[in-house]
Amino acid sequence: EPGQRWQWLIEHWQPYAVQTDQGQDQGLLTGYFEPELQLRRARDDAHQVPLYALPHGWQSGQRWHTRQVMDSDPALQQALADKVIAWAADPIEALVLQIQGSGRATITEPDGSQRRVRLAFAGHNGHPYRSIGRWLLDQGETRDGSWDGITAWVRAHPQRLQSLLWVNPRVVFFREEPLAPQAADIGPRGAQGVPLTPRRSVAVDPNSVPYGTALWLQTEGVALSGARMVVAQDTGGAIVGAVRAYFFTGWGQAAKDTEYQLKQRMRWWALLPRTVPLDQPTSTKGTGDG
């Protein structure tokens, strides 16, 4: 029963307020999800956007070619030909997949058969992520930097789509994994190495919040409201500091809608067993700006 669970929680776990080094206890909560794509194994007139596995010569932590170079260098494209997992029709959908880090796909093979897969994060080209929505806002091109606003801008300026995509130099590489029916309710593996749970898993800065930490999250907004227990199981390139998180919303249309709306203030408390002593029990501080 909910009352019994709450009683067990307060009897066995001690909350410690999480703060930045500057003493700030409020930060930003955004979301991420697993997008769903329809892909083709073979390139055709409608499917022209490649999704790559790790390329030859790639090394973690080293910078590789930018998105613009990969899109415009014929010799490099030829060298990458055997690393194309599948082809997408919509460049924006492909970019969303890369930003989210993983996704689910139905791949149509050349013989017409279809394969259900997960495209799991394998690595990236070492360049920093740059938001195309923020760039459009900074350039005065739009007043709406959301994905709906970006899509509307692209429809109005299709001839400028490629240059917009090149604003973000980062390219994410994937690993194809079979997605059996019995695994349909299991999330992708996060940085901790365990499958993510919708609305319970969060991505954090592991330098501030260790993986596996249970946290009591409080937030109020249109997309998410109230308090709940979450677990730090993943990370993201834009997450810096102790009071900053991505909330895993899951997969499907409802998860997508929540992710697109989720940008609000948050506070949270690290939940530690009452039997664990702490030298400084007042707060858990990180290194970021919150």
List each language-model region with its residue ranges.
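Solvent-exposed, well-ordered loop and adjacent helix/strand elements within mature globular domains
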Residues: 1-290
